[in-house]
């Protein structure tokens, strides 16, 4: 009953929020610098969606995120709620690599396209390579990108095998990887489930992992290093003092995001 009520409120709050954000975002998304204005609005959308589902958001280790230089964020993927949680928690401008089918969704797809998110067609290797090349272009332009190295959501909570594309981008560009561990999304909304369970999502930022001086042939070692970091961050190991976003404080904090 609680999950049914939370889902009903989530839909009543989230649907009009998504429609409005999609329409407005599509218009302002093309105001230079492209996508930045839409991303600020998306943070409001993300917090509203989470609050509508009675999902509390905590963020830990935001001070570890470098400012003024591009990075590759890499996060574990547990739930559809990963997207709003990460949008709300990441304190810098960032572009996501997301599966191509999301861009076909009315309003939501329009908004993420306007934000400059990059579609990835996992079924078409050539198109997938092109998407990673586009991500590399964004990095060269000074933009950070976020990649789910598993490329799909886990069903049992275990980390899935990593794909190498994001690691090759970071190595070739010589920019650090910031591991981001999510704890709680799968409990609130697991894959193949459509009823939200009220709860808490914690987003933990790890220390940047440098890639300067490493060769492309070192990608296997780098992948294992990131995997170990994500395994630790998904639990309570090395957690920084939490920052909680709730109610009006959640909305107010958006204005201080950079």
Locations of the language-model features?
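Membrane-embedded segments
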Residues: 78-130, 134
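Non-catalytic C-terminal accessory region of glycerolipid acyltransferases
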Residues: 129-258
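Conserved H-X4-D acyltransferase segment
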Residues: 6-13, 42-98
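Short, flexible loop segments at the rims of nucleotide/cofactor-binding pockets, characterized by
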Residues: 49-52, 73-74, 122-126, 155-157
């Amino acid at each position: 009953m609680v999950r049914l009520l939370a889902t009903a409120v989530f839909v009543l709050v989230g649907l009009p929020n998504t429609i409005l954000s999609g329409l407005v975002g599509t218009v302002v998304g093309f105001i230079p610098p492209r996508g930045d204005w839409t991303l600020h609005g998306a943070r409001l959308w993300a917090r509203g969606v989470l609050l509508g589902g009675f999902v509390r958001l905590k963020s830990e280790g935001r001070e570890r995120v470098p400012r003024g230089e591009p990075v590759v964020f890499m996060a574990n993927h547990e739930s559809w709620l990963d997207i709003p949680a990460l949008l709300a928690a990441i304190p810098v401008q960032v572009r996501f690599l997301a599966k191509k089918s999301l861009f076909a969704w009315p309003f939501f797809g329009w908004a993420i396209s306007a934000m400059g998110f990059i579609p990835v067609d996992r079924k078409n290797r050539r198109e997938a390579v092109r998407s990673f090349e586009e991500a590399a272009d964004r990095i060269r332009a000074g933009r950070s990108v976020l990649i789910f190295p598993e490329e799909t959501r886990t069903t049992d909570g275990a980390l899935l095998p990593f794909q190498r594309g994001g690691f090759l981008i970071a190595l070739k560009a010589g920019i650090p990887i910031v591991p981001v561990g999510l704890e709680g999304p799968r409990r609130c909304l697991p894959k193949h489930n459509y009823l939200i369970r009220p709860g808490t999502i914690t987003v933990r930022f790890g220390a940047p992992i440098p890639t300067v001086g490493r060769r492309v042939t070192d990608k296997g070692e780098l992948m294992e290093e990131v995997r170990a970091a994500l395994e630790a961050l998904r639990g309570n190991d090395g957690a920084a003092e939490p920052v909680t976003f709730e109610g009006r404080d959640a909305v107010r904090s958006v204005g201080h995001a950079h």
